[in-house]
Amino acid sequence: MPQTLQLTNPMDMHLHLREGEMLSAILPFSANPFSAAVVMPNLKTPITTTAQALAYKRQILSLCSTSFEPLMSIFLTPDLDKQELIRAKEAGIHILKLYPKGSTTGSEKGVKEMLCEKTLHIFEIAQELGFILSIHGESNGFCMEREYEFLPIFAHIAQHFPRLRIIIEHMSDRRSLELIEQYPNLYATLTLHHITMNLDDVLGGGINPHHFCKPMLKTKKDQQALLQAALNAHPKVSFGSDSAPHLESAKLNSKGAAGIFSAPILLPALAEVFAFHNALDCLQTFISNRAIANYKLKHFPIKTITLERVENPVPPYINTPLGHIIPLRAQTNLSWRIKEENR
């Protein structure tokens, strides 16, 4: 087995960077090893306009000590109009993010009726202008079936808007894999946690709130199917971490926040998984090439990340001015670490 590994232009196609002091504290974990990342718009005040997105991008870049391209997205609301979409396109923003209302953190201003006339009209304009539609696809039903119950909506949009590129974000259900095979314009992202864990890691040995996320971790069969898609670098699947930091105090209460903070360990942990399954030769394609192709990326900083096979202890917490954040794999040892970042 190789003792070192080079990755070129890692891409994270689903990332939560938050704002204010939290943004300042966590940004380096993503900006340093990744060339670019799709930045989620679900802030306390959602990013619903081009002006807001550009201001947020400037804030992110002002805090970067390395070359990094934030790929901004617009929070889709029923009030989004063609002029705003044109402004976004002219500013280099190509991603719309659709949240079903109340489906996850910061989605209170999301869309209530997925297929109403207003929403379909926005899809039509988005198709015309060449946008990518990224969707947190969950119903309001039983928590383990929410993604599956949303699949007919994905199918409807894919059928009626065949030139609109649609992303099933943070795919968690093996039945979603079957759907992306049916429609040429339907793609997906996969997280580290959905390919390495299942519901047993949340509830099997006592409740672990640090593994609680949306969409929920599913069954062992789901995990295995998604893992194989990653290990094989499925042509329609890109890596998207959905790294979502919450303070420890927000996770450890009676209404614990949904989200897993994986940014500090992403590349070493992925190297560990792919090495264990003798698939290191597919990691470059999964972590970068698929995103560049599926999102038609043309402008991003060139980076080479060198990893080495050596014990890498994960700290018990990440300290911020606001309090502690518990990272994924806290207080365990990874078998790979980042040795060098050429940027």
From Swiss-Prot:
Residue positions binding Zn(2+) 2: K97, H136, H170
Keyword Hydrolase part of the UniProt annotation: yes
Pfam families registered for this protein in UniProt: Amidohydro_2
Hydrolase as UniProt keyword: yes
Name of the top EC class for this enzyme: hydrolase
Record pathway: Pyrimidine metabolism; UMP biosynthesis via de novo pathway; (S)-dihydroorotate from bicarbonate: step 3/3
GO CC entries: cytosol
The entry's keywords: Hydrolase, Metal-binding, Pyrimidine biosynthesis, Zinc
Comment on bound cofactor: Binds 2 Zn(2+) ions per subunit.
Binding site for Zn(2+) 1: H14, H16, K97, D242
Cofactor(s) needed: Zn(2+)
Catalyzed chemical reaction(s): (S)-dihydroorotate + H2O = N-carbamoyl-L-aspartate + H(+)
Gene Ontology biological process terms, A to Z: 'de novo' pyrimidine nucleobase biosynthetic process; 'de novo' UMP biosynthetic process
Gene Ontology MF terms: dihydroorotase activity; zinc ion binding
EC number: 3.5.2.3
PTM-bearing positions, type N6-carboxylysine: K97
Membrane-spanning segments: none
Role summary: Catalyzes the reversible cyclization of carbamoyl aspartate to dihydroorotate.
Protein family according to the UniProt entry: Belongs to the metallo-dependent hydrolases superfamily. DHOase family. Class II DHOase subfamily.
Assembly behavior: Homodimer.
Protein name, UniProt field: Dihydroorotase
Organism in which the protein naturally occurs: Helicobacter hepaticus (strain ATCC 51449 / 3B1)
